[in-house]
Amino acid sequence: MPKALIQTYGCTLNQADSDAMEAILKGRGIDVEREGSASDDNYDYVIINTCTVKTATEQRILERLKRLQKLGRRLIVTGCMASANEDKVLGAAPDSSLVTTSNTHRIADALSDISNGSRAVYDAYVKPEKQGHFRGEGSAIARIPISEGCLSSCSFCETKFARGPLNSFSSNVILRSIEMAIKGGAREIELTSQDTGAYGADRRTDIAELVHAASELDGDFRIRIGMLNPEHLHKYIDSLIDAYKSDNVYKFAHLPVQSGSDRVLRDMGRNYLVEEFEGMANELKSKIPEISIATDMIVGYPTESDPDFEMSMRLIERVGFSRINVSRFSKRPHAGASKLKQLKSEVVKQRCISMYRLSRRMEIGSLTKVVGERRTILLTERNADSITGRDQSYRQVALREPGFRVGEFVDVEIIGNTPACLIGRPVGTVNKIEQVSYFRS
């Protein structure tokens, strides 16, 4: 039986694409491994699903491609670099085959071409109806893609160049994927896309309607809503708040503000003001008291001044985010900001250190405030020495007691925390589910 390795870099949408490619290849009788646990010599094909968001990640990918080219591996490159930076891919691995983001459904055809001695290239832009595929195999998480592309034109990002304009998938297809995943044993449903906040703008619907419909499906499960661009949130915030009230929906929102300065937001092409963002965040917290809000911040955007940076720091303090993903500005070749004069590296470095320290303090504070409380958590993944789950606010909780299985809902007392997660002690089990074979540890 032919054997393929799929290695994935980047976002949850990329992971969902890899899930789909894995399902397609297994359906064709190909043995598939993910991320690699053995030598590259053990695989007939190596599929690298790439990311183009950060320069550092891109450099790691290019080094990986160079090594595989040198080893003479039969290599397929997919993901955003295959779509946006084909020249860099071929510079590192001239013999590699290319499958762009909208053509991942052709992955089996690409392997067939290669086995017949041809170099495969599937790069025509198409608008597929992608489906979610639940892997199982020790996890209770199903990643369900709901759209591809976006409506925005952010000056720091070239992902739109890779994935194109917004293409929302049919809600019927999405709901069928969720139903199949739940029947297969999934308990956490991750709705993922480049921007879930834009979902449905091309279909006269929105993410709130989709979440509401999904939450009414049969079964015990939790829905995690993916990243929501604040630009779109005001259009449906009331109906989204109603959707959050379902027990089947995590009280969690990922709202990437990127800067606390209106001037920098304008330069970035972000179509909202800080006051508008803060108002929406406060409304969510007011009407859903248990909600946790995560955000992204870019440090060192070329036009960011010292006062602009301080505005970002103060915004973090005022909103009280549960998680802050701090990223140093990364110059991307197809993004408008790449043409701007860059800030001095030492200035950006010191700003990153300051924001990271503040972020860690805020994140730890959001964890310590729930120590001593009871929570019902969904166990989603088993690690080497613990099993971890999520509470209703999507905070990670680790248990060290044996005897529990992925997919169970467990009542715990929060007895402590690390800088990254809560530590729980079981006080009883609720909603025990019938175990299926791939949940066995």
What is each PLM-predicted segment?
Residues 1-198, 253, 275-286, 310-318, ...:
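Proteins enriched for Cys/Gly/acidic motifs involved in redox and nucleic-acid/cofactor modification
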Residues 105, 152, 164, 197, ...:
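Glycine-centered loop/turn positions within well-structured domains
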Residues 331, 338-441:
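Terminal RNA-binding accessory module
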Residues 255, 296, 316, 324, ...:
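Hydrophobic, well-ordered secondary-structure elements that form the walls
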